[in-house]
């Protein structure tokens, strides 16, 4: 799957991923009203609203982008109905030939980690048959429990030719409370980056490993260091746009070939219709997905321009 991601990035010339992280408050009123009229102000109604919201955004952007990243918590908050919306979103994005990164941040050990890996990336055995359930192409994983937590995911990645992105240096302000702690003269995130490179060394695609890393756009200097530590690992870069990251901050996340990183924007794209710059173009809540498409185009221009001028 890492090969497909690289190929899609090359074809679209867009090293970006759209984060499908829908809060109900983001959904335009006409969509929410229709869903509530049909299903009531219930978890099912909320799930239908966010599904329709996602579908419209995907329809407006799928030809421009290589991948999407649904954040499962935004769906889980609505219980089983929300997970149905998550599954519909994953399946629909696959119909559009998009790579799906499940932002699930799983982290456990042994059989529990294996069950997470099977559910999100592998096949579950039921009697004489096997099934792919959530069936994402990549999943985000928390490394805090060490190799015991990561190995079950790596094993499934090898078997299914899928991938993971391991949290290394995250974009949130308090990430340094642990991730910047010095151990033998080096910050913890560097040690984790070295383990990512080690875990990924024997599960390579054509150019990059199935085992990638999450490094926040809000920490460009750390990204520069980690790019050298993990030369064969793809970096998923959150924190662009709403969290403050800009194209000029991101050039060191990429290798000299212009590959090696994929930049996520969530609110900056899915809530673009609320921004004044798009309102000034005449975009309203009724045609919100047009703003999402324009935001994707602007993001591609920003990042491509920065890479061309580095």
Residue ranges, per PLM feature:
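A C-terminal functional module that forms or caps the active site or interfaces directly
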Residues: 217-264, 268-275
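C-terminal helical cap(s) of enzyme catalytic domains, especially alpha/beta-barrels
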Residues: 250-256, 271-310
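Conserved, mostly hydrophobic/aromatic
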Residues: 18, 68, 103, 139, ...
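N-terminal glycine-rich anion-binding loop in soluble enzyme alpha/beta folds
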Residues: 1-60, 283
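Glycine-enriched alpha-helix->loop->beta-strand junction motifs that scaffold or abut catalytic
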Residues: 65, 134-137, 158-164, 207, ...
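Glycine-rich, proline-tolerant flexible connector loops at the mouths of alpha/beta enzymes
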Residues: 28, 45-46, 69-82
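Acidic (Asp/Glu)-rich catalytic clusters
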Residues: 58-64, 92-95, 154-159, 227-230, ...
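Conserved anion-binding
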Residues: 104, 108-212
């Amino acid at each position: 799957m890492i090969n497909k991601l690289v190929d899609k990035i090359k074809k679209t010339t867009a090293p970006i991923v759209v984060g499908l992280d829908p809060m109900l408050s983001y959904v335009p009123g006409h969509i929410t009203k229709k869903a509530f009229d049909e299903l009531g102000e219930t978890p099912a109604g909320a799930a239908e609203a966010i599904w329709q919201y996602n579908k419209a955004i995907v329809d407006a952007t799928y030809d421009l982008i290589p991948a999407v990243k649904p954040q499962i918590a935004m769906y889980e908050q609505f219980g089983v109905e929300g997970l149905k919306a998550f599954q519909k979103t994953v399946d629909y994005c696959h119909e559009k030939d998009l790579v799906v990164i499940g932002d699930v941040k799983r982290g456990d050990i042994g059989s529990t980690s294996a069950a997470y890996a099977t559910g999100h990336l592998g096949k579950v055995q039921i009697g004489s048959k096997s099934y792919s359930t959530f069936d994402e192409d990549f999943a985000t994983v928390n490394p805090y429990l060490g190799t015991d937590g990561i190995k079950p995911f790596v094993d499934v990645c090898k078997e299914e030719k899928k991938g993971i992105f391991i949290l290394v240096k995250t974009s949130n302000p308090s990430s340094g409370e642990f991730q910047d702690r010095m151990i033998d003269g080096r910050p913890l995130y560097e040690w984790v980056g070295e383990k990512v490179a080690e875990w990924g060394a024997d599960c390579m695609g054509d150019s990059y490993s199935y085992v990638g890393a999450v490094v926040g756009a809000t920490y460009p200097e750390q990204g520069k260091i980690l790019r050298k530590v993990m030369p064969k690992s793809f970096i998923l870069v959150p924190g662009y746009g709403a969290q403050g990251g800009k194209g000029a901050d991101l050039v060191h996340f990429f290798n000299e070939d212009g590959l090696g990183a994929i930049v996520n924007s969530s609110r900056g794209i899915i809530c673009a219709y609320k921004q004044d710059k798009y309102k000034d173009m005449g975009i309203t809540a009724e045609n919100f997905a047009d703003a999402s498409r324009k935001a994707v185009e602007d993001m591609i221009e920003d990042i491509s321009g920065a890479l061309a001028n580095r």
